[in-house]
């Protein structure tokens, strides 16, 4: 399948007649059957390398070369190797095989002429090993040029086929990599959703079958081309033998004078060929980098040149030319030999590359021979279907994660405010617990003093028994007071139990905080996954851009193919012009070379048959190319539809996300209102605590008064017992408070970890932004390539139009000259008739020479009949040539239509690129907005934390925390500055892109019309008004905050210059082209000044008042 044309087996003798050319296969399927049936060894089919059919120029030049080549003979005893195959045409008794241009001498006077066939591979490529005598055949320059052209055509088609094979190989490798990656995950992944996605599997399987069918069609085309090359080579060999026979016949009739004329013409032709060869060598030196695939053909052409030079030298020496001419020929041969040595050196370098190409072909052959069976293909299809289902599930998860991100944003803001409120409540509860501890200690001291007083009272009880009677009344009164105090104590114990319940509520709130922190951690993980999915989306976008670049490459290849086809058409026109010139020369030399007319008429008839076959094969090749172009267009339209569907889905997702953001903002407002209610409740709790403190103070005063009056031991013991119970309860409270403090410190650590995670995610967002900038550069490069291709196509269309006009003029001149020739022929026939009449008169006078005169008249009549037949044939050929010219014109018109369609497709691609650029801008703006919102939320959170710490107390630890929070706040402010600068830079880049696009559209035409200049002027004026509005927002913010920010800044003159828009537009309509150009430059300068002034204001705001950057962002959004 990948072999070259040299690997041909033995050729069996053909059953065709010598005068008929072998029939060419009409379709690649027929060629495929023939190669399979004969195994590449029959006379009509050859398995080998790919190539194109010979053009009409090549066929004509080959026929002319064989017609003018001189005879050369082998000795009677020289034979070619015994293993050479048989001839396709046995005209004589000799069975040996000869290289092309070499003839065998006739062994006797038999009518069967001794000529031997040569193998097609030796004729085509010259790879035969014969003695030096047999290598002396004439190969003129036209044959070498024809071979070079055919081999170059074959090489271009081989390159195309190899390129298609490489593309198919890349597709196969991509599929293999996808399958290998999915096989690892397929073992652990299985879901019932795969049943719903069988349609996707079928689509993938159909794509694979289509690729295989394309590869099979390419192989069949290669085989078809190989068969056509072999058939044309056989036909050339037959034509060469016929030309040799006609040359022998003509040489036996005309004699030596005609040979002398032919040799002189050959010498002149050789001189012209030598000049052409010098030019060709100069071009070859320039194009050495493109000789990787031509070196193999150069070997055969150089061998043919050696043989032709040796033959020509021997011919010149045998005809007795001067010594000077021989010296000149020797000098030419020496130069040619030097050039050949240089080319041989290059050949040795490029043979290695040929070996590498053969190795790659064999690998491809083995891969496609060892293709997997149906079971493996089914398994691969199932893997692909599972992979597609997994991709769909990941897309659903992506949507869910986007919703969770929006929830996280709102919950992040809420959690920061709730943390602030909780910190305040904890500080209040901590101060209240300290106050309660102090109270318990005071009560303990009072109980100890009361115990001492009780012991003193016991000692004094004996002395006071006499006074008991008097004090009983006082005791009854004191009992009532004690009962009142007991009720008060009960109320205090109830309050203490309430404080315990409040502490339990605080514990529950702390557990809720823990749960919320865990939820925050999960949301952070979800954010990380969301960022990874965003990266995958960006990778998909890059793949889409690469696919666009590949499509552009394929379009460039199609344009290159169209160029090649145009070159082929130009060659056909040149061939037709050369044919007309040859016919004119034949009409001039009719009287001198009557015998050569017979041979040339027969060669022209053979040329017509060859041209018909070549034209049919070329038409079939063109039809195949058009089918492939239509197939590629359908595939491109399919890809565009898929991309449009993806864009619509992305737009729908964005709309959903925006709706969710609006809902979340409403939730935020509701939660802020609830936070305000909670703050009011906290203030009320603080006031109730103050009231309780005042009540406690009053109770203490009452207790002091009552302690002085207490005299009984029983009441003191009861008080001591109650005090001991309270003392037991107080250390449990202190332990609980310590536990709460430890939990608060742990929650602080977790919040710091969450902050570090948020910082890491921000860094990942920066990396994503850098990748997007790189992709923007790639898109700009692709746009420049498309513009260059469009310019080249416009130039080529203009050149084609010019060439058509020149060809029309030449064809008209040729027709006029042909008519003149016909008139001159009619005059010559009248003169001949007059001479015949005179000879009839002389017959009457000269009766003695009657027999001689009768013979002369008969011969003259035969000559006249031949002239008339030749003239009719020439007229028919002129008509055929005119028809061919009309066909060429029609083909050129079709090529123009194809060029217009390619230009339209390029315009569509440009519009698609502009849409992609607009989407990229939207994505960048959204990313910058998200970053700015996150930074503003973090700054507000830091401010709240700082305020809480400043309110709590003035310990060193809190001061350090406040300093750390301030440093973090400064860092966040710097990041917010950077983000605002990035957004300003993005606006400036968008403005510069629009300006560059408008200037580029204006530069495509050398002299733009006034209407083309007015449109960019209006766009620039619109941008100028936007910049003025933005500068007005910034200056208003600066004046509200601090007018000193704008100190030293003076706005440009264009900022204060205001005019009526309608009047300015009317003035533009009345301006000349030069005035419009000056106005365009002025407006561009004004826009540049305004942009620079806006950048300076923004820098001043960032330096002096970074806390109003949020308002600057709002101004940006309003101006955009």
Swiss-Prot record:
Gene Ontology molecular-function annotations: PDZ domain binding; small GTPase binding; structural constituent of presynaptic active zone
Biased composition (Basic and acidic residues): 801-824
Pfam family, one: RBD-FIP
Annotated region (Disordered), positions in chain: 1-54, 801-840
Membrane topology: Peripheral membrane protein
Modification Phosphothreonine, positions: 38, 1050
One GO CC term on file: anchoring junction
Name of protein: ELKS/Rab6-interacting/CAST family member 1
Taxonomic placement: Eukaryota, Metazoa, Chordata, Craniata, Vertebrata
Gene that produces this protein: Erc1
